[in-house]
């Protein structure tokens, strides 16, 4: 056989649902890569003969290979920090109170408007490197810290540039509808007009976004405004998603499902009717335990209902300066299990196959299958559950992206 590389002495957590074993596991396995794709995988005993003198062979020393991790919800590009708000919350102020007093998102908006693209790029590069060291091979990055046309475009341009200069694939999301900027404080509908009539066309003209998101909440955008933005995005051919039911149940998830959104994110206050709507539309539920933890919330997402209705559950970092300044997907695996009571298998699926579904890229990445992109990680672990069980010592040994060894 003519391959570019072969991996032996490994176990595979394929996350292939057609394999009945937990994690879609194949133990005592091997895998071959050709032209950036997975060319063969299966039991080591069935590996076809190949020229060991001309094809590089990598020995996994009994470790586990998983698909490359996918962080499907981040706000990775921003300037400044909000440590002062952290102190205020510990003194009793709520996230909502801080936001209504001009803090929160708006304070980061000010810092991002003042920062240039070079500064934002370097900050983003450092954060992307941190995720990459934990096995992340695809990341979603949202705008939303500009809230004016110029700065929203600036953030999205930086995200696109990161994707061009880093081995991690970057999917971009336009989140102009993240908060009401101060200049539109008493005219939120006017700001929605600006998003639809000026911002969105400018984003599309430069091909800066793969999707559009809205923060549907009582401190941000109401249902009517949310539908206007998402409908405009959908009409332009972009994927849509929604921050919904984080602080209250406004019915945003049902709206997103009706419009065919790829995902609804946060969903702590989602009810059974909303879960049923997601199930019927095939919309993913993105769980963000980092924000739940950091804001010291008590209302948990309806995990049992999501299981009951078969809604794909995704885990993501929600890395951002205000509610989840936690740049770690491995920690999300642990938090998903300890805080939301996911199983380790559900958690890993939420950072691989289901995360790919949330971004609409599941045909190419998210599981180990012949013909899929060769994005995978070798972990120094005895069982896949260890990825969620223990945190602090990074067990990621090798990362392969598009068939190339990028981290060793």
Swiss-Prot record:
InterPro entries noted in UniProt: Amidohydro-rel (IPR006680), HutI (IPR005920), Metal-dep_hydrolase_composite (IPR011059), Metal_Hydrolase (IPR032466)
Task: Give GO cellular component annotations, separated by semicolons.
Answer: cytoplasm
Q: Which reaction does it catalyse?
A: 4-imidazolone-5-propanoate + H2O = N-formimidoyl-L-glutamate
Give binding positions for Fe(3+): 73, 75, 243, 318
Record-listed E.C. numbers: 3.5.2.7
The processes (GO biological process) annotated in the record are: L-histidine catabolic process to glutamate and formamide; L-histidine catabolic process to glutamate and formate
A GO molecular-function descriptor: iron ion binding
Pathway(s) annotated for this protein in UniProt: Amino-acid degradation; L-histidine degradation into L-glutamate; N-formimidoyl-L-glutamate from L-histidine: step 3/3
User: Superkingdom of the source?
Assistant: Bacteria
Necessary cofactors: Zn(2+); Fe(3+)
Compartment annotation: Cytoplasm
List UniProt keywords, sorted A-Z. Answer: Cytoplasm, Histidine metabolism, Hydrolase, Iron, Metal-binding, Zinc
Q: Which SUPFAM superfamilies match?
A: Composite domain of metallo-dependent hydrolases (SSF51338), Metallo-dependent hydrolases (SSF51556)
Q: How is the cofactor bound?
A: Binds 1 zinc or iron ion per subunit.
Annotated positions binding Zn(2+): 73, 75, 243, 318
Is Cytoplasm there in the keyword field? yes
Residues given in the record as N-formimidoyl-L-glutamate binding sites: 145, 320, 322
Pfam families reported for this sequence: Amidohydro_1 (PF01979)
Write out the residues that bind 4-imidazolone-5-propanoate.
Answer: 82, 145, 178, 246, 323
Per the entry, what this protein does is: Catalyzes the hydrolytic cleavage of the carbon-nitrogen bond in imidazolone-5-propanoate to yield N-formimidoyl-L-glutamate. It is the third step in the universal histidine degradation pathway.
- Belongs to which family? Belongs to the metallo-dependent hydrolases superfamily. HutI family.
Q: What is this protein called?
A: Imidazolonepropionase
Record the organism.
Shewanella baltica (strain OS195)
